């Protein structure tokens, strides 16, 4: 079932002071066919973006996106919608940088307001060691031509006047990495925009449809079994987010080094604009930004145990309140309005697993993004579509192969604002 939003409303009739409106579906509802050129498991941003670029760039329009619930049900609709390219490794930075530049173009192309707000990101350091780590991070970004700089506490205060830079807080601010190209978007707008663009090009989106199995003959994908019937296809993309490792293990016999950890987020009541940048602290385990509606959107570190629960806990809400009011004392007394949780599919090196045709011909994987999935979705979808259409992995994606774990080529990506829980192992 499609969503209805104000950008697709027609005035039907005006009678006196009454205005009658007609709502149009952003995307249609298609019958499940018995044969598709490609099947994508997961109606999140990576799946929708790949479907869109398969149709747009490669003429592969017989594509089915299979979603067990509704599109955007998983991480696509539960994240805090922050985008940035301030990672540290040479493999990650070019991908995120190119992805950051794609967002404004995508909004024009889809003819859909994704509400991109280029507000910049501030990542705080609370010790000399933390400041040295940020110097390395800034140098890595600048080496690749990505705008980033190191700020002292007074410069941080100029950008965020409400920030407490005194030494009275538990962890005083020593400085910050400022990343001007970063910002925020509206995550549901991105989901709807990509769905609209994909279906306009002929892609079929099947919500409320569960994948039960993947058929393989002679080490080649031949079909997908769903609760609505069998689909014959030569290509399958596993883009199921938190459930991707389970699908890969149970349906394909390929175990992935992924832990699934709940990650929680909250929003406050609307406030007058005062926070013009995304702020984050790895020591306080908090990141926050102010939405266009005035709410403070904030997240924390992940739960310290593997789980598929999406329930929130009082402990994390209390932690967020304490951390936010230390960094931004003006938030004392502000109410949290709601909280939610999503699933982060974490790998040992905090980098994704992107692979295809290595184990089974026609089986592709785009998973293990943790809480970086939103930032990378459109650009990864573009390259993933190229991979599936040509059967040749683009250079940009080659470092993320599953074989890097067997070959001991872990990325070591540590440029994240939060810690990520327990020791990792080969789990499903």
Give residue ranges: language-model regions.
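Glycine-rich FAD pyrophosphate-binding loop
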Residues: 55-77
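C-terminal catalytic lobe of FAD-dependent flavoproteins
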Residues: 325-428
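Helical element adjacent to the flavin cofactor pocket in flavoenzyme catalytic cores
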Residues: 176-235, 243
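Glycine-rich Rossmann-fold phosphate-binding loop(s) that bind the pyrophosphate
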Residues: 42-48, 68
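Short beta-strand to alpha-helix junction loop
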Residues: 94-97, 124-133, 177-196, 206, ...
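Active-site substrate-recognition segment that forms the wall
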Residues: 52-56, 81-83, 112-120, 213-221, ...
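Extreme N-terminal leader/targeting segments of oxidoreductases
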Residues: 1-38, 53-61, 423-428
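Dinucleotide-binding Rossmann-like beta1-alpha1 core, especially the glycine-rich loop
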Residues: 80-162, 285, 323-324
């Amino acid at each position: 079932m499609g969503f209805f939003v104000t950008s697709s409303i027609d005035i039907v009739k005006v009678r006196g002071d009454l205005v009658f409106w007609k709502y149009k579906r952003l995307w249609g509802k298609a019958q499940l066919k018995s044969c598709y050129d490609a099947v994508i498991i997961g109606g999140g941003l990576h799946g929708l973006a790949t479907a869109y670029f398969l149709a747009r760039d490669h003429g592969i329009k017989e594509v089915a996106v299979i979603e067990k619930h509704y599109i955007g049900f998983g991480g696509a609709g539960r994240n805090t919608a922050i985008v940035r390219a301030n990672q540290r490794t040479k493999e990650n930075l070019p991908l995120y940088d190119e992805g950051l530049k794609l967002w404004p173009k995508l909004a024009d192309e889809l003819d859909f307001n994704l509400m991109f707000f280029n507000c910049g990101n501030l990542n705080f350091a609370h010790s000399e060691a933390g400041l040295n780590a940020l110097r390395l991070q800034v140098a890595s970004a600048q080496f690749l031509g990505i705008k980033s700089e190191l700020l002292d506490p007074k410069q941080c205060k100029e950008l965020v006047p409400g920030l407490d830079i005194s030494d009275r807080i538990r962890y005083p601010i020593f400085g910050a990495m400022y990343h001007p190209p970063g910002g925020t978007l509206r995550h549901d707008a991105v989901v709807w925009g990509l769905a609209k663009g994909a279906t306009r090009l002929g892609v079929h989106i099947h919500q409320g449809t569960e994948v039960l199995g993947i058929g393989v003959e002679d080490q080649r994908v031949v079909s997908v079994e769903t609760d609505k019937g069998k689909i014959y296809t030569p290509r399958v993309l596993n883009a199921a987010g938190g459930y991707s490792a389970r699908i890969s293990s149970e349906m394909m016999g390929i175990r992935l080094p992924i832990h699934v950890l709940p990650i929680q987020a909250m929003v406050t009541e609307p406030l007058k604009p005062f926070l013009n940048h995304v702020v984050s602290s790895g020591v306080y385990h908090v990141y926050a930004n102010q939405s266009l509606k005035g709410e403070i959107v904030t997240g924390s570190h992940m739960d310290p145990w593997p789980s598929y629960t999406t329930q929130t806990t009082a402990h994390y809400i209390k932690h967020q309140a304490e951390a936010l009011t230390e960094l931004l004392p003006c938030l004392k007394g502000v109410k949290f309005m709601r909280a939610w949780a999503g699933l982060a599919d974490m790998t040992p090196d905090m980098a994704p697993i992107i692979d295809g045709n290595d184990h089974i011909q026609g089986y592709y994987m785009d998973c293990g993004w943790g809480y970086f999935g939103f930032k990378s979705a459109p650009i990864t979808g573009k390259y993933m579509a190229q991979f599936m259409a040509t059967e040749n992995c683009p250079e940009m994606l080659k470092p993320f192969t599953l074989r890097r774990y067997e070959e001991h080529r872990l990325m070591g990506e540590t440029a994240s604002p939060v810690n990520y829980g327990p020791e990792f192992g080969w789990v499903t």
